[in-house]
Amino acid sequence: MGGDFRHFSSHVSLLLLFLLIVKSSSSFTPADNYLIDCGSSDETKLSDGRNFKSDQQSVAFLQTDEDIKTSVDSIPITDSNASTLPLYLTARIFAGKSTYSFYISRPGRHWIRLHFYPLNHPLYNLTNSVFSVTTDTTVLLHDFSAGDTSSIVFKEYLIYAAEKLSLYFKPHKGSTAFINAVEIVSVPDELVPDSASSVPQAPDFKGLSSFSLEILHRINIGGDLISPKIDPLSRTWLSDKPYNTFPEGSRNVTVDPSTITYPDGGATALIAPNPVYATAEEMADAQTSQPNFNLSWRMSVDFGHDYFIRLHFCDIVSKSLNDLIFNVFINKLSAISALDLSSLTSALGTAYYADFVLNASTITNGSILVQVGPTPNLQSGKPNAILNGLEIMKLNNAAGSLDGLFGVDGKYKGPIGGMSSKKLAIAGIGFVMALTAFLGVVVLLVRWQRRPKDWQKQNSFSSWLLPLHASHSSYISSKGGSTSRRMSIFGSKKSKSNGFSSFFSNQGLGRYFPFTELQTATQNFDENAVCGVGGFGKVYIGEIDGGTQVAIKRGSQSSEQGINEFQTEIQMLSKLRHRHLVSLIGFCDENKEMILVYEYMSNGPLRDHLYGSKENDPNPIPTLSWKQRLEICIGSARGLHYLHTGAAQGIIHRDVKTTNILLDENLVAKVSDFGLSKDAPMDEGHVSTAVKGSFGYLDPEYFRRQQLTDKSDVYSFGVVLFEVLCARPVINPQLPREQVNLAEYAMNLHRKGMLEKIIDPKIVGTISKGSLRKFVEAAEKCLAEYGVDRPGMGDVLWNLEYALQLQEASAQVDLSEDKTTMNIEMDLIPGEEMQSPSHSIP
């Protein structure tokens, strides 16, 4: 930095001049500065002043089996950052694993900037290229594809490098990889701190220096694009126009960049150049006494990561000190209360920045919302708020990845720990299951042909075989008597409507309950009658019709999320009737209420029977036998199988877990809580949707791709199966790290032949080995890493029924051997010789 000063006679003069240059310009000369225009034959000089070495000059850095390059004269791209477009006219192509290796002269953080554009090549279609890019410690891109030729792809990272930094390009099987340009550049130490404020507010987040970062958004608020030529670290700052959610409420403010000052020990031009601090957005009606909105910017991000967020402020709107005080919010959570810039900088027009780490749990809709707004009830100053710039960077996850759940070794590092699929085995199993399903359909057809004439009265087919569409059901008067079609029930009650009357009336929900009847049924909604609480409100036990117990779900008007899920549950249950789905009896919407009435499940959720009893409970819940557990799993599988295949349009439950499997007085299992359910697509394999569900049960592929299929329910059910077997929570953070996630821990032990180590000790010695083997086999298939490798619920049901047959057969044999351990062979009748259960739509 500062040039060669050896001709100065005094070392003191050298030091003074050096400090002067640093102070005045905050210039930075990187110790490592590798700029490569891949595939080019000549050096490329950009208009921003940077020189990229040609491919020939950089060949020493590359190790690859084949020398494949391509180039064009021009590309059909008009980009606002035109200075880098020459880099996309050439490319290196890799048919196999290839490596760029760079020697690092000064260890520390480095930029890794990657440029992609799929050029034409006579032998390779780069638009179809799929590949991964990693360093020795971090996955930068996993199964990446640049897509079509409509836009360039630029990726930017901050990675720690020691003596050598290697970039590995790994094409997907049968594909290629490519790269147009690579930048490896040293970064000032002060650019990223080791700690930052936490959001939600908590002790500071520490240890940032150990994380790799991907820069997702770098935005110049209130101004135009800032090119690398202006930024001392060659960064690009984009305009905030695409991100401003309410531009009508904001006003651009601009001052001369030369008037911006940097405080001692605070922000420098290396943190952000002065053009960033010289522009801002303020509130358009800042002169009003109480503006009733916030300035807001929304940026898309990925799920499953924490985010480093840097906000840039500079008071360029006030006429005097202490005239601007405002609040800062990130994802509607308080980040800074009553921010007074002048008290922090002691001057106007002075740069200031604040750093935060946003917890991954706060990201519910795939975006980050940054807001600033005036502090209410100001004693002095004018109600106003500003923001000058913002940066959002993704932190690597526990897999050491910035893109997905695979580690640098290519192994899956998600919730179940990298199981590999065996295609031939899956194909064989699939064939057998398909054949079994076909035979089941034949059996159904034969039964249909042989049905008795009075089949409707005798009910040869159970009423739950086919869906009962509520739009064709009858209204049963709450006073009893004959039924009559209820065409409209709201015409005379408009004054009492809660705003959802039209929604309810179109659903044909059956029995209508007056509010007074439900008050009586619950003793005026007595708190002692509460048997459950959720986002929708409370569930009460009540009695109707002279003693019939029911569950009464009373929606809370204060919860928007609960109301949305409440409506979804109405829509779903109005379509469905099945022995293994909780039945909807009726509803009430008087007095601004939203109340649903269900059949009462006296034995509560399955989870309570597995590990719900408290220690030293005087009335503990009896332990479920292995046979009972199998029957409960079979019933639940039947309910889910019906959801997926039995309705006119398949339904994906999306929240399968043991608290949503309820048991009646006979321990018959019924699936409940359809608040998160989605209709399956009619013509596509998945539904693109925001990720929802319960931690520990969530399908990692759904989490990763945000594409919901019925196989997501299958994954969750696989977790349930292990929960039933082991009788412990699916997530227990108090256990050692390798034991926290039940599904992952169980699969690891199963692969080692040590699964008996965590089986519920209350049933150890009662499970036949064949039954256990078939049960665990079903659970393992459900937890396959890719949905395409998981069985359907019908096939899972078949395996569970088979496991039950094996258990029953074993129980009939008088064993002379000791049955106290799981290591003793308990199946005198081999599983292979058992008669397979006939399979049909349950």
From Swiss-Prot:
Its EC number is 2.7.11.-. One of its GO terms (cellular component) is plant-type vacuole membrane. Pfam families: Malectin_like, PK_Tyr_Ser-Thr. Residues 447-842 are cytoplasmic. CDD domains: STKc_IRAK. It comes from the Eukaryota. Belongs to the protein kinase superfamily. Ser/Thr protein kinase family. This is Probable receptor-like protein kinase At5g61350. It comes from Arabidopsis thaliana. The lineage of its organism: Eukaryota, Viridiplantae, Streptophyta, Embryophyta, Tracheophyta.
